[in-house]
Amino acid sequence: MKVNPNNIELIISAVKEEQYPETELSEVALSGRSNVGKSTFINSMIGRKNMARTSQQPGKTQTLNFYNIDEQLIFVDVPGYGYAKVSKTQREKFGKMIEEYITKRENLQLVIQLVDLRHDPTQDDILMYNYLKHFDIPTLVICTKEDKIPKGKVQKHIKNIKTQLDMDPDDTIVSYSSIQNNKQQQIWNLIEPYIS
């Protein structure tokens, strides 16, 4: 699968179902804790530097951001979870917004859950993965920041994350570095069956 980086646009930032775009395109949602690198991942996958706004400040994405990717699919950037400085009320609001999207959106075909390869999955990572499995949502786990781990230890870290998430044998886990940028095609190939 190839995408034209010049044919990508943010369609809408939504907080409720009525605002979701009316489209026939399949959707791939990206979830992960705050600062795991969701926006950086989106930018590196589509070959654009600043399409999805990155921030040093965790918890910056507060809406569901729908990106039309070359009229082939829609990436949905979901607010990051597990950010302590967001108020309890705000966390509950995010929770409801994400739940409504995940449980009601028929266009949703796949969730890419991003976890930090350097660390054990957080309790929130585990809860999110279990939540997706509870609703039978196909999930691709991408371990970000691969470049921060010595090459010889990458597989050990992947195995650890797979074990701690208690991953479904049908789900795939891949390590990724937005800096090395060498696995986009592999990931597009994993996404493609869900959107055709």
Curated annotation (Swiss-Prot):
Requisite cofactors: Mg(2+)
GO CC entries: cytosol
Biological processes annotated in GO: division septum assembly
Binding residues for Mg(2+): S39, T61
Residues involved in GTP binding: 32-39, 59-63, 77-80, 144-147, 176-178
InterPro entries: G_ENGB_dom (IPR030393), GTP-bd (IPR006073), GTP-bd_ribosome_bio_YsxC (IPR019987), P-loop_NTPase (IPR027417)
Cystine residue pairs: none
Xref: SUPFAM superfamilies: P-loop containing nucleoside triphosphate hydrolases
Transmembrane segments: none
Role summary: Necessary for normal cell division and for the maintenance of normal septation.
Family per record: Belongs to the TRAFAC class TrmE-Era-EngA-EngB-Septin-like GTPase superfamily. EngB GTPase family.
Protein name: Probable GTP-binding protein EngB
